[in-house]
Amino acid sequence: MTRIVVTAEIRPSEDEDKVKVAVANFFSFKSSKVEEGKYRLFVAESDTLSSLSKFHRVLREERILDAARKYLRRGIEGDRLTFMIHKQAAYVGKITFVDSENESPLGPITYTVFHRDLEAVVDWLAPRTSRGRPLWDNPMPED
């Protein structure tokens, strides 16, 4: 079963709608909510890998498949894949991976993907390349 959860803090100085746009630029969510806490937290969810199709497309447009593959593979732990991108870059339609929350001053956008075959998910999102070109284009794994 596939489950994708994307979270982003909404800091007091931020416009909630802009945070939602930053998330929606790369993730087509099925449901969303705002949770209250130290910071408000925007939580978006989906139950299908097709919700990552925009992310898949932009990785190719920006020609960052090698870097993406490295970050994605590093984020696999058991049945989950976790990675973070820079929220302000996402708002303007750019993917910038971050290693820690400190690299994104207003907090990162955190993706958590649950799927039975995370290696296949990584191979679909960011296949191996040669001289910057994908060696193959894998189909999206089944949910």
From Swiss-Prot:
Q: Which family does it belong to?
A: Belongs to the UPF0201 family.
Which SUPFAM superfamilies does the annotation name?
Answer: RL5-like
Q: Quote the Gene3D superfamilies the UniProt record gives.
A: 3.30.1440.10
Q: Where are the transmembrane segments?
A: none
Coiled-coil intervals, chain numbering? none
The protein in question is named UPF0201 protein Msed_1787
Q: Which NCBIfam families match?
A: PRK00447.1
Q: Which InterPro entries match?
A: PAB1135-like, Ribosomal_uL5_dom_sf
